């Protein structure tokens, strides 16, 4: 099996075990355990029997399922941890809900849009490699991406917090209509909980670094997107600033380890 497949398999085993070690309600435990067992079987089957094309793209399915399944671990927010995270936001930005009110509407619209479409960067990075004849780098790419994203999801079993938008007054931003639309998508199409470190930042940085050594121009574009998402996390109140910094550190660390030990 590829290293990326092992990462996914071990993560689903982790979910199946940790849900019984935390006070998760029984129906959720059943869902987490059952879906995790199915995914372990799927990963093994794909690794052994699926065509190379399917195997190359399957990690995007694994990480997507893992994201929503991890959300089932959420029990109750740690208000003490939330207060600590907010303290740093207020120390650095004053009142972050009004700090960016004077930023131009086009910039706010761009940040909201790139944040909302973050999930497209994961297959987008591999598509850039595959379409330029570098599909052989699938395992290297997905090892970085899965390790970064799942590494951000895993601590949710312990560090349980709500995103800033769930506990603050609405942010005052110039592009209010688009921000309301982006907020609606975030509230209704995501798990609605906060990941510490930020999965958005960790994984998009991994996407960029997974592409840049082979396709420098494309990698720079993805790097700009990753930086924009990091800024958008704080401006749109989707993440705390500490989440963003921790996510960047995680993404860099994962990519450094992958480069050092190979994939």
Where are these regions (language model features)?
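Terminal transmembrane helix and immediately flanking juxtamembrane interfaces
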Residues: 1-191, 205, 209-224, 228-231, ...
